[in-house]
């Protein structure tokens, strides 16, 4: 098993308010126009972009997003690697910034004709060897959770917990379960 990865620090609303207003407004507009993303994906994109632009505030003098260059973005990516984030976390943050840049290129072509997406496929994410350690429920935690759900009469969640715990299936696999296959 690899080394345990660190989690990104959350950017609070207070910290976010210190970020260049132009960048904050552009992020907000970008998120509002991502109608193809689920609510959970939007939350992740918002978090990834907040982390990035707070880093820009701290390390690039709060530069506007349309002025950032490739070498400056690479410093951010190296910062994430040095912090001990997992490879998948770094790739996701890279994807957020790239999607944001593509949005600017498409929507603001007239206003910023020389702007290009500075996040490119040539920028490889270093394999860090860091992973997030999975912490399965202990038998006592499982019993306590089942008891709490039963006390709340939340039988659907109780059935899900019992099924997934006893079979070891993943969330996506559990969704595929059909009532027709359950035998009395």
Where in this protein do the model-derived segments appear?
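N-terminal DNA-binding module of tyrosine recombinases/phage integrases
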Residues: 1-37
């Amino acid at each position: 098993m690899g080394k345990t990865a660190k989690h990104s620090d959350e950017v609070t609303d207070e910290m976010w308010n210190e970020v260049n207003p132009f960048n904050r407004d552009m992020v907000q507009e970008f998120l509002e126009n991502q109608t193809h993303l689920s609510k959970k994906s939007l939350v992740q994109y918002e978090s990834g972009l907040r982390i990035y632009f707070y880093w820009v505030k701290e390390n690039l003098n709060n530069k506007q997003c349309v002025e950032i260059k490739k070498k400056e973005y690479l410093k951010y990516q190296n910062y994430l690697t040095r912090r001990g984030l997992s490879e998948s976390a770094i790739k996701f943050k890279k994807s957020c910034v790239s999607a944001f840049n593509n949005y600017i290129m498409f929507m603001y072509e007239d206003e910023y004709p020389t702007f290009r997406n500075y996040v490119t496929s040539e920028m490889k994410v270093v394999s860090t060897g860091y992973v997030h350690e999975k912490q399965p429920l202990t038998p006592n935690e499982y019993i306590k959770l089942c008891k709490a759900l039963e006390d709340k009469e939340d039988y659907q969640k109780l059935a899900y917990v019992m099924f997934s715990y006893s079979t070891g299936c993943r969330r996506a696999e559990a969704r595929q379960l059909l009532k027709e296959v359950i035998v009395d």
